[in-house]
Amino acid sequence: MDANSINSFFLIGALLTAVSVLLSPMSSRLGIPILLIFLAVGILAGEDGPGGILFDDYSTAYLVSNLALAIILLDGGMRTRVASFRVALWPALSLATFGVAITTSITGMMAAWLFDLHWLQGLLVGAIVGSTDAAAVFSLLKGRSLNERVGATLEIESGSNDPMAVFLTVTLIAILANVDTEMSFSFMFISFIKQFGLGICLGLGGGWMLWKLVNLSKLADGLYSILVLSGGLIIYAASNKLGGSGILSIYLVGLFLGNKPTRGRHAILNVLDGMTWVSQIGMFLVLGLLLTPSDLVDILIPGFALAFGMILFARPVAVWISLLPFKSFSSRDRWFISWVGLRGAVPIILAVFPMMAGLPGAQLYFNLAFFVVLVSLLVQGASLTTAARLAKVELPPKPLPVSRSGVEIYPSSEWEVFVYRLSESKWCIGEPLKRLAMPDGTRIAAVFRNDTLLHPSGSTRLEAGDILCVLGQEKSLEALSNLFSQAPENKEVQRFFGDFFIETDVKLADLAPIYGLSLDNLADDMTVADLVVSQLGANPVLGDQFQWQSLHWVVAGLYEGKVTNVGIRLPTEHAL
């Protein structure tokens, strides 16, 4: 490659990236996933689009996509709270294993019938599109206030289901490439255990070593993020090299670092946020360039049948069977999880495997995977907000600070500065600071008014437009945000958690005469907390609801996994 070609490469790459960034606001206006914008830019720049760029280097696409996916999973792991595993780990693992296998089987049979393929070839198509995509799920769920059980299950599933899909894809390619070779069940079982076992061990072990290394190192501030990124990629590559799941390993590395006091954690997350955006743009641009839309014309009708068959039948069946042991999931939860089986980059990456192996029909597999991804992003991704509202798994948006930044006083400091801007409808307007019930361990460090820094005292009264800088820790974030939150304008949001609240240590016997509750066959000392556990199980989450006798009960407050208060909606009001 000469200097002119290199400059042309830089020019085209930078131009496509800039166009993708500038077009990204269209995502919210059109109600479509932002990843689809990046993919569309790549397709338009490609062979059949106005750009006319001929790109058919599957090896380069595979390299770029795997690197990008590793970075996205590292960032996603660092932002996942281990506390969510309390309610979502086992359901997510069931979906990541049994769910993928069931989806693969049903989708594979449909593909074999629709495209007149051998049943093994059909299963290969099913395996390629069988897993949900972490990049798509993390991107579309980011910033959404979903029921914790549902949101965490979807995120953990997307971060851990790729090993199963990779295992099935690689195994089926090996069988199809050597049809005369018999592969024993024990061999396949050992391969499966190796993928998951090595992936988990190297992810957690490598995460611990990297965490120790980061905290013991004394580096320039900007180098910690590079150390984490390079360390994560080392573990990712080592896991793949040894036969484990690099995807699972790097997700667990991020999970370990994100849930431990890590030196420079906030700076690392800021850098990873930018790297994740670059990775998403680069990955979907390259995959878009790889597609020749005219090749999809011949598979249009059966392709739609396959995509909608997977969305409307295979995925729901897999979800309902996989979640059978978990009674805490309501029917609405299950339907929403079924609908958010988003496909993205991973199926396209897996579709490159047969191309690189030189399998007959590999181009068909690739085109089918791409078509399914396009339909999934357009149909499921674009309707995510509507689906969440219909399934009633979306909680009222949590009040959050305008910005937050770390205060790196100590190597593993967890102190942060939260910035709040007070509008006229904030609850605390007009109140002196001394009357604010500030959470323990927090302090208002500064108040800005009309671009002027005030020296706050107990008598300082807050005004609309004030900007507050509050020093505290993440554990106090919810209490602070509620204190400085805006009064909800939407009446439905106001009523989501009920007409009034009661604490869970209240005895039902005390409520019975007020609300006409019948307590036959119930213990005299039964509390509201006991009722919640009997109705929702041991691990309820914020927003969980149930109807009991004439009242509608909603979990309205949690502390360290325990329900602290419950909202009650009166029977005279219409129930959700």
Swiss-Prot record:
Keywords linked to the UniProt accession: Antiport, Cell inner membrane, Cell membrane, Ion transport, Membrane, Potassium, Potassium transport, Transmembrane, Transmembrane helix, Transport
Reactions the enzyme catalyzes: K(+)(in) + H(+)(out) = K(+)(out) + H(+)(in)
Membrane topology value: Multi-pass membrane protein
GO molecular function, one term: potassium:proton antiporter activity
GO-annotated biological processes: cell volume homeostasis
Function noted in UniProt: K(+)/H(+) antiporter that extrudes potassium in exchange for external protons and maintains the internal concentration of potassium under toxic levels.
Localization annotation: Cell inner membrane
Primary residence: membrane
Bilayer-spanning residue ranges: 6-26, 34-54, 58-78, 87-107, 109-129, 163-183, 185-205, 219-239, 242-262, 271-291, 299-319, 335-355, 359-379
Domain (RCK C-terminal): residue spans on this chain: 405-486
Gene Ontology cellular component list: plasma membrane
SUPFAM superfamilies assigned: FAD-binding/transporter-associated domain-like, TrkA C-terminal domain-like
InterPro entries with a match to the protein in the record: Cation/H_exchanger_TM, FAD-bd_PCMH-like_sf, Na+/solute_symporter_sf, NhaP2, RCK_C, RCK_C_sf, Transptr-assoc_dom
Pfam short name (any one): Na_H_Exchanger
Organism from which the protein derives: Shewanella baltica (strain OS155 / ATCC BAA-1091)
Record protein name field: K(+)/H(+) antiporter NhaP2
Gene3D superfamilies on file: 1.20.1530.20, Regulator of K+ conductance, C-terminal domain
Family in the record: Belongs to the monovalent cation:proton antiporter 1 (CPA1) transporter (TC 2.A.36) family. NhaP2 subfamily.
